[in-house]
């Protein structure tokens, strides 16, 4: 009976302890390092946040290309899927910052233009990744998600260009 009570108490502690640990890091994204999360948190404007998220996405995409060209001996599939998921997370977060900036009527024109430009570049890179190789089954589903997420972000950026008013033009006297 004492053993049963001990197991129940231990299980409850681990269950509730996990919730406390998660609550301690409210804004931490699992695909960002602590330094990257600090940079996002310290960014003063939405344009800066968009730029940071896109640079992190670019970094993940470069690492993915390297990993495809130089496969590691261990955990290759896990690494590819992790990089693809991190890339999609960065793109989605940049799109979220754009939507929030539009709702708050902030000046995010540069961020929108950068998003439209970069997502087109990223889509070209993603489409060049082979899907017919024997290893492609390991990451094919996440690659399709990445392509779809990038296309959606590109469409949203183009739509946001039309929504956001152009900057005022000064008249010369």
What would you call each of these model-derived segments?
Residues 22-173:
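Long, charged/polar, soluble alpha-helical segments
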């Amino acid at each position: 009976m004492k053993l049963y009570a001990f197991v129940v108490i231990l299980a409850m502690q681990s269950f509730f302890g996990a919730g406390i640990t998660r609550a301690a890091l409210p804004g931490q994204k699992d695909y960002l390092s602590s330094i990257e999360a600090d940079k996002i948190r310290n960014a003063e404007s939405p344009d800066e946040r968009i730029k940071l998220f896109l640079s992190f996405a670019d970094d993940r995409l470069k690492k993915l290309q390297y990993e495809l060209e130089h496969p590691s001996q261990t955990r290759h599939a896990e690494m590819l899927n992790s990089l693809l998921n991190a890339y999609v997370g960065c793109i989605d977060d940049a799109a979220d910052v754009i939507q929030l900036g539009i709702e708050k009527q902030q000046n995010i024109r540069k961020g929108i233009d950068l998003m439209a430009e970069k997502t087109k570049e990223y889509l070209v890179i993603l489409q060049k990744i082979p899907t017919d190789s024997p290893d492609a089954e390991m990451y094919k589903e996440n690659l399709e998600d990445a392509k779809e997420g990038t296309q959606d972000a590109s469409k949203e950026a183009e739509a946001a260009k039309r929504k956001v008013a152009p900057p005022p033009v000064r008249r010369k006297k």
